[in-house]
From Swiss-Prot:
Pfam families: PepQ_N, Peptidase_M24. The gene is pepQ. This is Xaa-Pro dipeptidase. It comes from Yersinia pseudotuberculosis serotype O:1b (strain IP 31758). GO terms for molecular function: aminopeptidase activity; metal ion binding; metalloexopeptidase activity; phosphoric triester hydrolase activity; proline dipeptidase activity. InterPro entries: Creatin/AminoP/Spt16_N, Creatinase/aminopeptidase-like, PepQ_N, Pept_M24, Peptidase_M24B_aminopep-P_CS, X-Pro_dipept-like, X_Pro_dipept. The keyword Hydrolase applies. Its cofactor is Mn(2+). Mn(2+) 2 binds at residues 246, 257, 423.
Amino acid sequence: METLASLYNEHLSTLQQRTRDVLERHQLDALLIHSGELQRLFLDDRDYPFKVNPQFKAWVPVTEVPNCWLWVDGVNTPKLWFYSPVDYWHSVEPLPDSFWTKNIDVQPLLNADDIAQQLPVQRERVAYIGYAQQRAQALGFSAENINPQPVLDYLHYYRSYKTDYELACMREAQKTAVVGHRAAYEAFQSGMSEFDINLAYLMATGHRDTDVPYDNIVALNEHSAVLHYTILQHQPPAEIRSFLIDAGAEYNGYAADLTRTYAADRDSDFAALISDLNTEQLALIDTIKSGERYTDYHVQMHQRIAKLLRTHNLVTGISEEAMVEQGITCPFLPHGLGHPLGLQVHDTAGFMQDDKGTNLNAPSKYPYLRCTRVLQPRMVLTIEPGLYFIDSLLAPWRIGEFSKHFNWDRIDALKPYGGIRIEDNIVIHDKRVENMTRDLKLA
């Protein structure tokens, strides 16, 4: 923990420097960052599960406590008003005493509404960062100082460059997720249902289903052709052919996002396709380096998908280059190669080209690509190619001019398996790429 404490000190210094810069640029005195508020269900007396403001947990690893406030000016010790009411109806988090609290001025906030009296009176040049805009207005913040876009753009852009503390947290999240993936694979091997496989994952990771950074995707057979399948059938299918799991974990607010696909019959054609996609994914990662645009690797992955379509006799009589040019690979790989990862699963600034918020959109041919950045050291991204058999995407190709090149009998034979996705989390360094997932031997 001493090591994490020293890394956090450096992390805090980096955030303070960024804060000084953004305040000076926009003639502000401070930022007031709100953890968030509970949101009440309509016509009910219960609340939705609390999800913290990512800009708040960038500063402090407080992820489950609403009504907290952080005052930062880039110079003085950050001040945290920590919500700690007297309450016998609900459990209350005690005032934190951890590796990070020596660097933060932590003050208890007994009542959520008391923050108005706690804040400095002069706050005309203070920006509110959070989603409770009505609360900010009640505190006297002007509209232009509630989530000002230029400030958010600056903060989002530099969140792409992870500090050593953030990388350490993300490696810990990887460890937890890998434990869960191994438990889920064992559950799949024993013939469990999607629902029970998910329970095995949660048990192994120590997460509740509201704690994971995104809804776990646990898909058997053709369900894995639904990219964000989250139904979780309670009964296993009569025949189990394949298993796709896309599930992550969190550590101090930082996410892991991993996907693996398995065939029940290791000697099947589908198993061979999984193996070859795995080979192509690793080969692509071996080519990734700082200074190159992420979009280029997405296009290269489509070239590799074309190779697989040819070698597995799924598309014939047309060159790999023509497959990519004509978009034949797109119904098989309809999503992007991956996305930035960090405090959020789909982390901010994937399209942002500078700290002023200049965006470069995804190419029109690949509209679901989530990152167009030039890769730089300290960026963390997912690499998650897929190869799916999705009826709705393949249907137009059955009647088009290129239909004759599709081996429909073979495609239809693989449709009951759903699809494949293989996802690793990588860190860009100066002279190498760190594969956090494979470093933990998750095959």
